[in-house]
UniProtKB/Swiss-Prot annotation:
Binds 2 Zn(2+) ions per subunit. Its EC number is 3.1.2.6. Belongs to the metallo-beta-lactamase superfamily. Glyoxalase II family. Pathway: Secondary metabolite metabolism; methylglyoxal degradation; (R)-lactate from methylglyoxal: step 2/2. Zn(2+) 2 binds at D57, H58, D128, H166. It catalyses: an S-(2-hydroxyacyl)glutathione + H2O = a 2-hydroxy carboxylate + glutathione + H(+). GO terms for molecular function: hydroxyacylglutathione hydrolase activity; metal ion binding. Thiolesterase that catalyzes the hydrolysis of S-D-lactoyl-glutathione to form glutathione and D-lactic acid. Zn(2+) 1 binds at H53, H55, H111, D128. Monomer. The gene is gloB. This is Hydroxyacylglutathione hydrolase.
Length: 254
């Protein structure tokens, strides 16, 4: 087993620690301080840093962490500009192997050109591509790229656990409800996540099979989602990619 430890950072970021005995990997350490505190509290040795993309709230802690753990390896996307450190830059289909854990690299452009996700052992570390009940903004890529990236992630097994990088779930669900007000899965999820957040608990990880029921960005082929997008756009939409494009621009101003 590879327990995953949640490290909250900033206002709504999550940094993930993947643990094996007294060793660990860290995913998207935007801030070193909470990571160092957790490593010290648990007496863990940092073996490697995994980055999904180049935004500062995901890479800002790299220099300090490497200062404390100079032998830790650094991995990140080959097609994104990475921190000025020696690292192994990864592309689609590459693998990381660590204490029996094999993580496959999946190129998921959209949020950034080079954004990657790490998948293995039933876990998906997807940065700012797929969120619970939502998806990332398009800072560099196109709607077509993001839609294709989400479709690729949606093809993973139902029991895949999604470890994304932000606590956006409730706001995403409110948008989903605006799109599909008659979707009972969305209504039930709002109740569940509201209770978790009131207790100060994270809404993550989320199960991919459940996401297909309430994440409207994974439901662009559904008539109910298409109808709502057409009503918002005041035009007919020919395919799921067009529906996604409308949903993403709608969410940007929701």
């Amino acid at each position: 087993m590879y327990p995953v430890i949640t490290v909250p950072a900033f206002n709504d970021n999550y940094i993930w620690l993947i643990r094996h005995e007294n060793h660990c990997l860290v995913v998207d350490p935007g801030d070193a301080e909470p990571v160092l505190e957790r490593l010290a509290a648990l007496d863990l040795q940092l073996d490697a840093i995994l980055l999904t993309h180049h935004h500062h709230d995901h890479v800002g802690g790299v220099t300090a962490l490497l200062g404390h753990f100079p032998h830790a390896r650094l991995y990140g996307p080959k097609l994104d500009p990475m921190p000025a450190h020696h690292g192994q830059w990864l592309d689609d289909g590459d693998q990381i192997n660590w204490h029996g854990l094999s993580l496959e690299v999946i190129h998921v452009p959209g949020h950034t050109h080079g954004h990657i996700a790490y998948y293995g052992h039933g876990m998906l570390f997807c940065g700012d591509t797929l969120f619970s009940a939502g998806c990332g903004r398009l800072f560099e890529g196109t709607p077509a790229q993001m839609h294709a990236s989400l479709q690729r992630l949606a093809a993973l097994p139902d029991d895949t656990l999604i470890y994304c990088a932000h606590e956006y779930t409730l706001s995403n669900l409110r948008f989903a409800y605006a799109v599909e007000p008659d979707n009972h899965a969305i209504q039930q999820r709002i109740g569940l996540i509201s209770k978790l957040r009131q207790q100060g608990l994270p809404s993550l990880p989320s199960r991919l099979g459940d996401e297909r029921e309430f994440n409207v960005f994974l439901r662009c082929e559904q008539d109910s989602v298409k109808f709502s997008a057409e009503k918002h756009a005041l035009k007919c939409l020919e395919n799921p990619e067009d529906t996604f494009t409308v949903l993403r621009s709608w969410k940007d101003v929701f």
